[in-house]
Structures are given as structure tokens and as C-alpha cells.
């Protein structure tokens, strides 16, 4: 009736950012919908044809988890359920919660055309996604790459940054010694480069050490070897005192101070040399190395971190699989007793066909309320890496790409 009476007037359209269809609305959802309804009604009372377009986000892990919980209660194995059946259950589950949400929104007094809502799981929406993906494939913006991505070892899938919440966690840290193997500097011979890491499990994936040429380093001789097995070590001069305190070493002396540039051409042995890690570890210059914490030398595991990956890629150092889908070490880890993770994924390039430039232009043409929203979105787009669009899951829009089983090429 409102639409009929408002026909011909200037339109104001609020296209809703969709809630997720997997449970009852909460206080945040209610606040969101009430505020939007107030805006819609204000413009309607102000003489406009004010339209609210409701919608729901229906794909993804949260709904899969709910269906998996049902299987667990019935003592069923999800992997034994035909994919077609699993997807139907996910679709039915999402549809059920959309209907519940509609009733809950109406109880809040929200006005909208709830008979003609949009949903990401509608066949029309899924078909449009495939069409748009095809455009990226044809203009070569869509490509398969091997990069570190956020990985869930429980669900065995890549994740988006927006799907992750960072929690404070206390982890064990270690210092590790990399014995210098090759160098043209006499004062570096027989010394051990010391690194500090909060992720000891990445040591088997180490392929390089990073230093900063503008940092001053010291060759140090330790008298008390109780906490360090190596007598001659190398760390950043400015961090030496804190390292000695952390390791409870009281007696030591500085043999020589030198600039990071003297590391050029130096390579080390892996700490696990005696159990099969016989590859050389080159020392590489990197500006991301700083004096905020650690030793001033960074251990690089290219399959577990974006900075490490990019540095090794730049220096033609290959990554290798050391952790599988479940977060367990693979057979690539030699004779070792038993997470960013580098995996082959599909990406949309932000640089190809000026996608980043187009996105920034669109942001600048948009009015934001409040204006801080623009700053936040702009910073995300300006600095974001290529967009990982693939997931190792069932409930989503499949990538319509065929892979040759023999060559593994698309």
C-alpha cells in the first residue's frame, strides 16, 4: 500500500547488508534493523518513495557446522553423506531461519517487502556469481596461485580475513641457532646466528634468514653455556642485553660489532642438519626486520607467512609443504618426530585490469556516514593482497573450473 501511494516520488533505497541465516536475531541484529527502519520511515515521511530491500547471507561454514552437529548427534559421518544431500540440508536450514528472521523483524516493527527478499543462495544469485567469475577468468584476472592463506586445520579450508577473530594467546617461544656455513668475513666464521620465534612448529619449513642492512649486529662470546649450547653467537647489538636477561646469561663479551650489510653472501646450516635438513639457509636482506623484539634476525618459513613467502619468492627460493590440511606435519618433513599455510588456491588479481584502482575510484564516489567508514574501507582496499575466492567446502557456490587430473592444470 505504501509503495502504491508513493509511486512516482523520488526514490530512497536502502539495500540491506544481509544478516546470516543460522540462528535467532541477537541484540546487535535488532539494533541494526531498528536504526535502518527509522531511516527508511524518516525518508518516507519526508515525501520520498522509501524502499527497504531485505536480504540474507546463506552460504559458508556456520551453516555447515550446524548440519555437522546434527550428524554428530545421530552418530553419522559427514564425509559419508552424499554432497547433494548435504547441500540440500544446508539450503533447507538457511531457508527455515530466513522465515524465522522475517517474523522476528516484523515483531520489531520493521517495514519491508519480505515476500521479495534477496538471498545469496537463490539460484538467480548463484548463476550471476558464476557469470561474474567467468568474466574474471576470461580477462585473466582469475588465477591459481600458491600462497600463504589463513587456514582452518579443523575444517580443512582456506578462510577470509573477515571470517577470523584474533584472540590473545600465550605461546612458547624459542631461540634457535643457525651455524654459519659459508661467509667471506673471517669474524663471522664458526659463529651461530640466533633467531627468536613464537611459532617453533615452523622451524622445519625454514628456508632463509632475514636481516636488515641498517641494523648493527654483534658477535658475542658466552662464558656460561648452561642456556646456550653455542659459545659464539650473533644478535642485534640493541637487543643483546634483553636477550641475555631472558636467557639468564650473566657472563659474556662482545668480540666485534658490524653492520647488517656484512651478512651479504652468507649462508647457514639448518638447526636440524643432523636429522636430514641438509639444505643451505641463505641470509637475505629485508626491511621488515626491526628491533621491536627478538634478535634482529628473522627466521623465514615461506609456506607459513606472507612476508616470508614474498621474500623467498623474490629470491627464487621455493616453498614446500610441511603441514597438511589437518595441521599435521607431512612426509616432506624428514625424519622428524611427530597457521598461515601455503596452499594452491584460486585468486582474483587486484592489479590485473586495474581492479584496485577501480575499487578506490568507486569508494571516492560514495558518501559515507560516518566518514570514518570511508577511511577504514579505503585502507583495506589499498593494502589488501589478491583476493582468495576458493574454499575447500561444500556449502557455497562452486568454482566452475575443470582441472586436468594428470597435469593438475585448469
Predicted features along the sequence, with ranges:
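Protease-associated
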Residues: 208, 215-297, 306, 310
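N-terminal catalytic cores of NTP/NDP-binding nucleotidyl/phosphoryl-transfer enzymes
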Residues: 6-67, 129, 195-202, 282-311, ...
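Residue patterns forming the tRNA-binding/recognition surfaces of aminoacyl-tRNA synthetases
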Residues: 1, 68-204, 224, 265-268, ...
